[in-house]
């Protein structure tokens, strides 16, 4: 009887140890899955997060001017739309009193390693603000439209969302390309062009990417 009791206790201990090991293994696996889930950069998510950060940390009077994307691969190569970096550009007016103020330009740079905030004292004068614009075309949708059209793809990894200052009042554009060649995707209608709609077609100016 004593031997049977010892045998039963030994079996219970073995089962208990195995149960603990299974629980421990499950806890170790969970963080790995979580960490993989946050490695993909989603452009629209960074915009929302940065808007909230600017509003909470730097004041309500801000202007969202640009969102830049750096692709992992070249547009005219094997690019599948994967993203290496996203940069969101804001300008904030800091009122000192009723007659004076300072302005700062904030850039939020997102990579898989994290987010870096940079600021300079000055103005952003290259674009119209995007705050009140109805941007309905996502980055992913714009990329797919560029890949589907029969235009030569620029040798570039750069994309920017902006509403350019020009003689023609045009919608915000997703601009894919470099300083010598661009493809424009209307961020409201989705129309794809190989010329800048903010300028007459016969007086085109190439956009110089500034980041």
Which ranges hold each PLM region?
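Exposed beta-strand-loop-beta-strand "reactive/processing" segments of non-cytosolic proteins
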Residues: 57-110, 157-202
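Short, solvent-exposed mixed-charge patches
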Residues: 209-211
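Long, charged/polar, surface-exposed segments that mediate recognition or autoinhibition
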Residues: 104-158
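C-terminal motif of bacterial Sec signal peptides marking the signal peptidase cleavage site
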Residues: 15-21
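Bacterial lipoprotein signal-peptidase II cleavage site
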Residues: 21-28
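Short N-terminal edge-element motif at the start of the domain
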Residues: 28-71
